[in-house]
Swiss-Prot record:
Protein name: Serine hydroxymethyltransferase
Cellular component terms per the entry's GO annotation: cytosol
Site (Plays an important role in substrate specificity): 225
InterPro entries, A to Z: PyrdxlP-dep_Trfase, PyrdxlP-dep_Trfase_major, PyrdxlP-dep_Trfase_small, Ser_HO-MeTrfase, Ser_HO-MeTrfase-like, SHMT-like_dom
Originating organism: Halothermothrix orenii (strain H 168 / OCM 544 / DSM 9562)
Length: 412
C-alpha cells in the first residue's frame, strides 16, 4: 500500500492499526472471517471504476463487455455451488438481499412471519427499529422455553392465525440445525411463500454439513462473508419462476449500479468454496465449535439449547452473575473478541444483554484446531472469573498474544 501511505498517511496508519488488531486478537465474532489475498485483490481491482447499471447484455451503459463476463462467471459459480435455478449476485449486502425479497413478494403492510430477534433472528427480520419492521407487518415466532429450539407448534399456530404472505426461516444467533422441510410444509398449508436467510450457515450448506434450503425454499438469501469466507456482500438464490421479479426488485427497485469489483471478489469466493479443501475447512469449523462448547460447559457455563450443531454458540451468563456487555468488555481487554448478545426470553436491554455469542470461522481460518479451542475456553473462563483483577487480565492477554503469534492471520 505504498501509494496509500504516500497520499493519505492517516488512513494508511489506521488500516495498519486494524491489521495489527486482527493479527493480535483471537477473533470469535461468529459473523467475521479472514478473506484470502485473491479475494482481497479482486475487491481492490480496477473494476471499481466501471459503471454497469442493469444485467449482463442488458446494460444502460456502454463498455460492459468485460464486466458482463465477470458477472456471468460469478452467477455460474454460485449456481454450481448451491444448485440454484436462478442467482442474483448484485445485492450489496445481506440486508439488501432480504429487502429485495420482501419488496418482490409482499405489498406494503403485508404480513411476514419470521424469527424474533431476541430468540436468534436478525434485525432485518422485522425489528421495529429496522426498515423491514416499519414497512411490513411482521409476526414473530421463537424457541421453546425448555429445549430452546425452534417452536414449530408456535410457527404453525401463528401461520394459521395470521395467514402471512411470506414465511422466513434463518437466524443470526441460533446454534442448531434448522428443519427447512417443516417450514415448507407450514408455508404450503397457509399458501405462503417461503424464504430462508442462510447468511450464517452458507459455508456449511455449500460443504454439505447443513441441509440445503435451496431445493425447498422459494427464495434463499445470504451474505458472501461469514462462513463462506468471502468478500462482504449479498446473494439471492431463487426458483426460476421468481427470477424476473427478484432481478427487478434489485435493479431498478433498490439499487443502481452494481459493485463490479465486489462481484469479481464474489466469483473468487465461490471458486474457493468449490474446492475440496473448503469442505475440510467447514468440518473443522463445526468440530472446533463443538469442542469449545463442550469445554465451556465443563467450566460451568450454560449454553443456550445445550450446545451447537454449527459454527456458533450462545452463552447464557446469568449463572455467572455477569452481563453480556461486561463480558465483552473484559474479554476485549485480554484480546478475545466476542459480541454481547440477547438470549431467548431476555430480561435485560439489548445494550446490556445476558449472553455472548461465540463463533469459530475466523480462528479456524487461522489454522487453530481442537487443542486451541480448549485453551481459548480456559482463557475465557479465567478472564470472566478474574474480571476485576487487572494484573491477572494482563497475564491472560500475554497468553492470548502468544497464541495469536503461532497462527498467522491468513485464508491461504
Amino acid at each position: 500500500m505504498e501509494f496509500l501511505k504516500k497520499v493519505d498517511p492517516d488512513i494508511f496508519g489506521l488500516i495498519e492499526e486494524e491489521d495489527q488488531r486482527q493479527r493480535r486478537n483471537i477473533e470469535l465474532i461468529a459473523s467475521e472471517n479472514f478473506v484470502s489475498d485473491a479475494v482481497m485483490e479482486a475487491a481492490g481491482s480496477c473494476l471499481t471504476n466501471k459503471y454497469a447499471e442493469g444485467y449482463p447484455h442488458k446494460r444502460y451503459y456502454g463498455g460492459c463487455e468485460v464486466v458482463d463476463k465477470v458477472e456471468e462467471l460469478a452467477i455460474a459459480r454460485a449456481r454450481e455451488l448451491f444448485g440454484a435455478e436462478h442467482v442474483n449476485v448484485q445485492p450489496h449486502s445481506g440486508s439488501q438481499a432480504n429487502q429485495a425479497v420482501y419488496f418482490a413478494t409482499v405489498p406494503p403492510g403485508g404480513t411476514i412471519l419470521a424469527m424474533d430477534l431476541t430468540h436468534g433472528g436478525h434485525l432485518t427480520h422485522g425489528s421495529p427499529v429496522n426498515m423491514s419492521g416499519k414497512y411490513y407487518n411482521f409476526i414473530h415466532y421463537g424457541v421453546t422455553r425448555e429445549e430452546e429450539v425452534i417452536d414449530f407448534d408456535q410457527v404453525r399456530e401463528l401461520a394459521r392465525k395470521h395467514q402471512p404472505d411470506l414465511i422466513v426461516a434463518g437466524a443470526s444467533a441460533y446454534p442448531r440445525i434448522i428443519d427447512f422441510e417443516v417450514f415448507r410444509e407450514i408455508a404450503d398449508e397457509v399458501g405462503a411463500l417461503f424464504m430462508v436467510d442462510m447468511a450464517h450457515i452458507a459455508g456449511l450448506v455449500a460443504a454439505g454439513l447443513h441441509p440445503s434450503p435451496v431445493p425447498v425454499a422459494d427464495f434463499v438469501t445470504t451474505t458472501t462473508h461469514k462462513t463462506l469466507r468471502g468478500t462482504r456482500g449479498g446473494l439471492i438464490l431463487c426458483k426460476g419462476e421468481h427470477a424476473k421479479k427478484i432481478d427487478k426488485a434489485i435493479f431498478p427497485g433498490l439499487q443502481g449500479g452494481p459493485l463490479l469489483h465486489i462481484i469479481a471478489a464474489k466469483a473468487v469466493t465461490f471458486k474457493e468454496a468449490l474446492q475440496d479443501e473448503f469442505k475440510g475447512y467447514q468440518k473443522q469449523i463445526v468440530s472446533n465449535a463443538k469442542t469449545m462448547a463442550a469445554e465451556l460447559k465443563n467450566y460451568g457455563f450454560r449454553l443456550v439449547s445445550g450446545g451447537t450443531d454449527n459454527h456458533l454458540m450462545l452463552v447464557d451468563l446469568t449463572n455467572m452473575d455477569i452481563t453480556g456487555k461486561d463480558a465483552e468488555t473484559a474479554l476485549d481487554k485480554v484480546g478475545i473478541t466476542v459480541n454481547k448478545n440477547t438470549i431467548p426470553f431476555e430480561k435485560r436491554s439489548p445494550f446490556v444483554t445476558s449472553g455472548i455469542r461465540i463463533g469459530t470461522p475466523a480462528v479456524t481460518t487461522r489454522g487453530m484446531k481442537e487443542k486451541e479451542m480448549k485453551l481459548i475456553a480456559k482463557l475465557i473462563y479465567q478472564t470472566l472469573k478474574n474480571i476485576n483483577d487487572e494484573g491477572r487480565l494482563t497475564e491472560i492477554r500475554q497468553e492470548v498474544y502468544r497464541l495469536s503469534e503461532r497462527f498467522p492471520k491468513t485464508a491461504e
